[in-house]
């Protein structure tokens, strides 16, 4: 199931690029930028792009790089800008049903993908709101400046010259959004998004059907004449997902012998012995996410291991595995940028030129997701039972 989803996602990203959908959203999103709200809008813009594409790395390395150039021209500290970029990018990586980490967490916890996304609202929404308030307040320091930057102008000009930017190109994400709201299955929903984008690409961009099919297989490959725009649009396709699929298979191969050898069971029994109550068990399961991540540097390893450790235990305790899948993301996916020696932390430092230590305090979303998830476990707010009902919050239990 997750491998099929990743294949469909790769096809959809490519089709949305050639249909002009992603270029249109990027173009008009960048037009909204204003100096006083630069950090605030940069975070939102990165969120939109990351949600639509499902890739934090792609957002950071394309739009993030452009926004960093704009920030330098405005005299806005790059660590603040990096924080806004990382928060927006990983909000999308966490909440987008197109994201490999989202698919992996749902798969390892054995829960429905879209139900998993909705259950993360309890920790993600408050963490994101705090972050947006921070960026909005910081923006008051930079009012009165003017947007400048070669990369910014080049992207706008390159997108405008290479694509027919129109509201019609926004139809594919609208169709997907409607189907998601109607609670349709993920694969047919994304399939509809691909079909609509395929038609829109032919109608609005004059795209060759054979070229679109080829791009959905091998990824988009076009020359706009502007290197940074090439980086923005040349991605997607089934081939782009092969590394991720390989990692998922490798993680599964890694987790299987751990369980077969008894290693997983030993850890599982140790956790159960320490945890005297379901609350204690879930607290330990959440804490295990960053601990395992620091050791392995990859949630492709930590999520399958956690799924092996805790999924059945959640059933036995009468709690929904959606709580577990949320823990995997709050303690795993969004923690990756904080680990300097991890792939994600090293990638961000190399791309934006800022270390995790420098942007730590400007990305509260990253660590507040963990905090709000912990509060959910302790208080019972936003915690779901195995039968689908919500746990009675602690303060109501005391009152009664």
Please describe what each predicted stretch is.
Residues 94-97, 105-157, 345-400:
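Juxtamembrane and boundary regions of transmembrane helices in multi-pass small-molecule transporters
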Residues 1, 75-79, 105-117, 260-263, ...:
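Juxtamembrane helix-boundary/capping and inter-helix hinge elements in multi-pass membrane proteins
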Residues 1-26, 137, 141, 166-181, ...:
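N-terminal alpha-helical transmembrane segments of multi-pass membrane transport
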Residues 1-72, 224-312:
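Membrane-embedded alpha-helical segments and adjacent helix-loop junctions characteristic
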Residues 36-49, 75-94, 280-293, 317-338, ...:
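Alpha-helical transmembrane segments of multi-pass membrane proteins
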Residues 11, 44-48, 69-70, 132-133, ...:
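Alpha-helical transmembrane segments of multipass membrane proteins
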């Amino acid at each position: 199931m997750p491998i099929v989803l990743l294949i469909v996602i790769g096809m959809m990203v490519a089709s949305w690029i050639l249909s002009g959908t992603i270029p249109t959203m990027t173009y008009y999103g960048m037009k909204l930028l204003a100096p006083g709200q630069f950090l605030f809008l940069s975070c939102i813009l990165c969120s939109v792009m990351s949600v639509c594409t499902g890739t934090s790395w792609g957002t950071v390395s394309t739009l993030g790089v452009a926004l960093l150039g704009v920030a330098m021209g405005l005299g806005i500290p790059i660590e603040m800008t990096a924080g806004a970029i990382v928060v927006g990018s990983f909000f999308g990586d966490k909440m987008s049903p197109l994201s490999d980490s989202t698919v992996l967490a749902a798969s390892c916890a054995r829960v429905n993908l879209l139900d998993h996304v909705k259950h993360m609202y309890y920790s993600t929404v408050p963490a994101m709101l705090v972050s947006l308030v921070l960026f909005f307040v910081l923006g008051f320091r930079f009012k009165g400046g003017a947007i400048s930057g070669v990369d910014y102008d080049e992207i706008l000009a390159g997108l405008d010259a290479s694509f027919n930017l129109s509201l019609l190109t926004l139809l594919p994400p609208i169709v997907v959004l409607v189907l998601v709201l109607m609670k349709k299955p993920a694969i047919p929903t994304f399939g509809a998004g691909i079909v609509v984008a395929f038609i829109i690409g032919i109608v609005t961009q004059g795209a060759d059907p054979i070229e679109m099919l080829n791009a959905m297989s091998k990824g988009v490959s076009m020359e706009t004449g502007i290197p940074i725009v090439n980086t923005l649009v040349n991605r997607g396709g089934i081939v782009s997902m092969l590394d991720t699929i390989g990692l998922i298979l490798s993680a599964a191969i890694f987790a299987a012998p751990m369980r077969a050898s008894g290693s997983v069971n030993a850890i599982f029994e140790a956790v159960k012995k320490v945890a005297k109550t379901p609350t204690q068990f879930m607290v330990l399961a959440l804490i295990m996410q960053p601990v395992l991540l620091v050791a392995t540097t990859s949630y492709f390893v930590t999520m399958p291991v956690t799924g092996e450790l805790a999924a059945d235990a959640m059933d036995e305790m009468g709690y929904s595995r959606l709580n577990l899948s949320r823990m995997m993301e709050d303690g795993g996916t969004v923690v990756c940028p904080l680990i300097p020696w991890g792939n994600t932390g090293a990638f961000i430092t190399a791309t934006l030129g800022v270390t995790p230590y420098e942007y730590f305090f400007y990305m509260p979303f990253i660590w507040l997701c963990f905090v709000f998830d912990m509060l959910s476990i302790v208080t019972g707010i936003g915690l779901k039972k195995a039968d689908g009902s919500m746990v009675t919050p602690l303060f109501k239990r005391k009152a009664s």
